[in-house]
Amino acid sequence: MTASVARFIESFIPENYNLFLDINRSEKTFTGNVAITGEAIDNHISLHQKDLTINSVLLDNESLNFQMDDANEAFHIELPETGVLTIFIEFSGRITDNMTGIYPSYYTYNGEKKEIISTQFEISHFAREAFPCVDEPEAKATFDLSLKFDAEEGDTALSNMPEINSHLREETGVWTFETTPRMSTYLLAFGFGALHGKTAKTKNGTEVGVFATVAQAENSFDFALDIAVRVIEFYEDYFQVKYPIPLSYHLALPDFSAGAMENWGLVTYREVYLLVDENSSAASRQQVALVVAHELAHQWFGNLVTMKWWDDLWLNESFANMMEYVSVNAIEPSWNIFEGFPNKLGVPNALQRDATDGVQSVHMEVSHPDEINTLFDSAIVYAKGSRLMHMLRRWLGDEAFAKGLKAYFEKHQYNNTVGRDLWNALSEASGKDVSSFMDTWLEQPGYPVVSAEVVDDTLILSQKQFFIGEHEDKGRLWEIPLNTNWNGLPDTLSGERIEIPNYSQLATENNGVLRLNTANTAHYITDYQGQLLDNILEDFANLDTVSKLQILQERRLLAESGRISYASLVGLLDLVEKEESFFLISQAKSQILAGLKRFIDEDTEAEVHYKALVRRQFQNDFERLGFDAKEGESDEDEMVRQTALSYLIEADYQPTVLAAANVFQAHKENIESIPASIRGLVLINQMKQENSLSLVEEYINAYVATNDSNFRRQLTQALSYLKNQEGLDYVLGQLKDKNVVKPQDLYLWYMNFLSKSFAQETVWDWAKENWEWIKAALGGDMSFDSFVNIPAGIFKNQERLDQYIAFFEPQTSDKALERNILMGIKTIAARVDLIEKEKAAVESALKDY
């Protein structure tokens, strides 16, 4: 750990916080006091605080000298003695709308604007906004929380633990909660206001509840409640460690910066990731199930056992990202959710970003406090990390993996660990050297491409770091599990190259074509060459869904790097034209089409050919499934229809255009009542056809009026299709009004509009002109990085690259943004170069298709 990040636990080790908060919603202020019991190692100790007023610091009723240090979000205390002691601190602070610390969430109920109060203390900086503490994950302690607030009739307060002494609350107005288990400060949470919910119990007696504002219908709680109960029961069986606390409450918040937060016993969510109403799509239900399962995995991996410092954040997130799929696959096997695991976790983004020179490794040290935020890189820590955990699980076997986890939880419960502690537990359970296997994957950035070819009857396998764009090859090597389907081949590729003789004999002795990385569980791609590729493509129809998806994903990445021509991908689409798997259609096929679209300019002959390709690819799905849902159809059919119709409407396929227009007219008086699975594409179609200011205003009004987060997202996307400057100016005029667009959702508007050629120039100029406002509104929000990353994922010509560099390069002094800016420049440059080299070939391939 570098010295630039001060570690306060080295001078004071807290054991218990007895915390009282008195919150005044109307004044947006709070006062409080905290008695912190702990061991002082030194006479000079430091505690974290951010934007707090420290009124007094007492030890045994005697005032202590202290010095404020706002620059380091701290204050420093002089103690007369060391050892175990209790410091009493009185303080006050303000409630802001930054969605960090203690903050309000706003919603509309019966036409009136209301608010609830809740907390967000992760990532590293936010518990200190609510009370003085050692705000570091290693500084675990127990918490006794008491709350008082300007309550209104019917208000409810929730926290990590059950309420105690409720009979006294009627006299004092103070809500008091049971002592928490030993845990990190970032996991403390509470929420209060006009809330309601439903509860159930697991077979082991844990009370599970789903809660939201009174604006949300009670029946929208049922789905998540059922999932939560069954997932907890699954994890208890799988880990062989009981859920450790009495309750598991899940609270949907109207305003929330992250997707969800694993506070122990009181998990908080964006409403879209917890609530499922009767008019919901299969895709949204599956998304809710995965998010709930992810947060519940953290109750063991992250809460019960916690990383010692943020550089081991991957221990939390990589594991939870994998276990969400393991658990949901176990409780809902009919969803075939594991077919989507190789891609659904943002793996395509991970494989793309991880191929850019300069990317971070999964495990990286933090050299500056502001860099802690950058550790939450979803493509690397979440998606790549989960892929590595899945690779490890397969390498060990599920039985040894689960056995090792049980030992890990039992040994380290209520304490902190580093990655090596997990490796030791898994090594003991399996008899394998996990550390030597995993270190190259966690400590090195990037990943390898394995080239496979046959030369003179010798199978040659070689590894090299895979890059997209300009790079410096440093000769990195990985311990690669080959996971081949043939006998007679090595298990692992450790060196740069291996040669296996007698290929023709091996082919005779084995069934099927040679495949590496079967089930696509390891974090590398394969470049099959010559006859090996020909064999796979000839046998493509006989491969399983995951293998088909993997082959197309790998060929696309090879095209992104320039190792093969992008134009060659056009012909590969023939292989999946009649496939009915949702994952093949929505992921492999969609990724190739999205890649090809970057080479196409609007209103050109090439666009005509591209749309013809799209219509051909999805016409079979439309003819098979139609426009309207059929009674008793599978979730997969619903999701395939949704994807196919979206593409066909994009490609102006008239039968779908007319059908969508008819649906809109039938629901014109209440567009929210359109079936959720097709509502988004119906709204898009209407905007494409009508393109009027009055429709823009209608959509904006519907956006403000609804409490359905999915509907809001669909309206945002539909609005981005307008090609009307007056309408665009009207939309941009709404973005800074928090009563219209919540700050947490601003990035969705930015992403949707910036990706459309008509709006791009205007929206890009708006973002640059309003950058300081965006920074002020979202500086504490985990979506702030998106305003650097989104244009990097969209821009595709030299003019935009030059503009991106001119605007962002001067901001690289901001450590929280530096890596994303430098990565963004490289990403756009690689795209510009690829399009320049391949544009003519792609246009020709589309014309000849």
UniProtKB/Swiss-Prot annotation:
It comes from the Bacteria. Its EC number is 3.4.11.2. It catalyses: Release of an N-terminal amino acid, Xaa-|-Yaa- from a peptide, amide or arylamide. Xaa is preferably Ala, but may be most amino acids including Pro (slow action). When a terminal hydrophobic residue is followed by a prolyl residue, the two may be released as an intact Xaa-Pro dipeptide. GO terms for cellular component: cytoplasm; extracellular space; membrane. The keyword Protease applies. Aminopeptidase with broad substrate specificity to several peptides. It has more affinity for oligopeptides than for dipeptides. It plays an essential role in the metabolism, it may be involved in nitrogen supply or protein turnover. This is Aminopeptidase N. It comes from Lactococcus lactis subsp. lactis (Streptococcus lactis). The lineage of its organism: Bacteria, Bacillati, Bacillota, Bacilli, Lactobacillales.
